[in-house]
Amino acid sequence: MTAFSLADLDRIVRSRAAASPDQSYTAKLVAAGPAKPAKKLGEEAVEAAIAAVQGDRAGLVSEAADVLYHLLVVLVGSGVALEDVMAELERRTAQGGLAEKASRGRP
């Protein structure tokens, strides 16, 4: 297992988002507004799902990395801290899966 973490990627994305859009793909995505990085996130998620269905392990690893990167770009562009997402995951995992899902009050 690598020592590289989601928090490490978050720091990199935040740093690159603060750069000039002329010099950073991340900054260019963030500067384009929320629709562009959200669209990329959706595209990468679909590609990851396709790789999973096809049993393409290497493709799934690659696409999952793209999903995580683009999710962090969306979070940064939306002003949402990774820590907030992690706190929500921690809250949810404190209960069993079905009990947690029922507590959300969604249909």
Curated annotation (Swiss-Prot):
InterPro entries: HisE, PRib-ATP_PPHydrolase-like
Record keywords: Amino-acid biosynthesis, ATP-binding, Cytoplasm, Histidine biosynthesis, Hydrolase, Nucleotide-binding
Major localization class: cytoplasm
GO molecular function per UniProt: ATP binding; phosphoribosyl-ATP diphosphatase activity
GO cellular component terms attached to this protein's record: cytoplasm
Protein localization: Cytoplasm
HAMAP family: HisE
Family listed: Belongs to the PRA-PH family.
Name of the protein this chain belongs to: Phosphoribosyl-ATP pyrophosphatase
Organism field: Methylobacterium sp. (strain 4-46)
Gene: hisE
